[in-house]
Amino acid sequence: MAVGGNNWSMWLRMSRVHLRQITKSLDRTLISLSHGNFSHQYNRNIFVTWWKSLFEASTAFRRASGLTVSPLTRRGIARFDHFRPVPNVSKFASFPRVPKGAPRGLFTNWNMTTSKRLLGQRAYSTSSIKFTQEAVNNMTISLRCFFNSLGGLNQCSHSNSCKAYQNASNVTSKQDHVQPVALKKLSQKDINFIRNLELFKIMKTQNEVVDETSAYYMEKPGSYIEFTISEFNVNGTFSAPLSFLDPSLLADLDEMIRNYKYELKSIYSSVDMILQNYGSLPITFHRNKIRIHFPNSTVVETEKLIAGLNIATGVIYADTSPDISLEGTNLNALVNVDNSGSVWSFVKEPSFPSRSAFSPILSDASYDTYELV
């Protein structure tokens, strides 16, 4: 019997060792499959925690029946049911029920509805509703404090809300002529009425109906981009009217010339880029300004076209000059009257047959030599 007892204890000891090794291997497998999603306190005993939860005492307790005779029942002490397993208790039940893909740690008020089909989960957040209610409550409290600071409404005219609001506004102006009356704090009904009345006044006085069919709001096609060539002025750099030649003065003059050339080259490159992308558009010159016209585009559309070329040196305006690009009309050419460059006039010329005076926007570069004289 002694030998049998020793063998039995040894078998139990070996069984415990093997069970411990099996649980460790199961823990490592679960951790590798979960990619470290378990909390640190369960990283080493996941399987043991789940196994113990099947046999832990449930929170529900009951009194022993009257037929059972025990010291506990005689004393009226409740006992726990140690052998009743708790249903659906697992490690995953302790995780927060947050839907897959939801931002963790941002919202805590997730309402979950577990579906019985395929154990699917649905979630919706009440954060926006909660914040809206808080904003309404803050507005209500601020309005209540504001009107309470004025002394409240007239109690004598409280039956009529409109008269109450009028009397409350006239109390301060007629205090010297009217005997004091009993005032009370604003009720929720008064606050709602005043709030609705103020909103109604705002809606009546600060509304604006935009008539999109009006010619004022309809933008007509026709715009141009204007490049301004700055004047080469040396007075801004050399303040003294009289100076003497020296290397530093020549270096400053050379830098001014190089900067002026760079500005001219940037304008030329912008104009050349418009020609290469949008074709033979109308161009006019006036003193130190170069204007490239877009007859078929509004200001907004022209801004988009110019922004697509990364051009930032010109200014776009609406074109209010006579339309010279309509087919079937006479071509109006700009002619310098006094050869001074300051006075220009329009001269009618016969229109070209079967084509417009200028190529449309977004067309290929034309090889015809039609230009403004």
From Swiss-Prot:
Lineage: superkingdom: Eukaryota
Induction of its expression: During stationary phase.
GO MF entries: proteasome binding
InterPro entries noted in UniProt: Stationary_phase_5
Annotated GO biological process: proteasome assembly
Function recorded in the entry: Required for survival at high temperature during stationary phase.
Record-given protein name: Stationary phase protein 5
Classification lineage: Eukaryota, Fungi, Dikarya, Ascomycota, Saccharomycotina
Gene assigned in the entry: SPG5
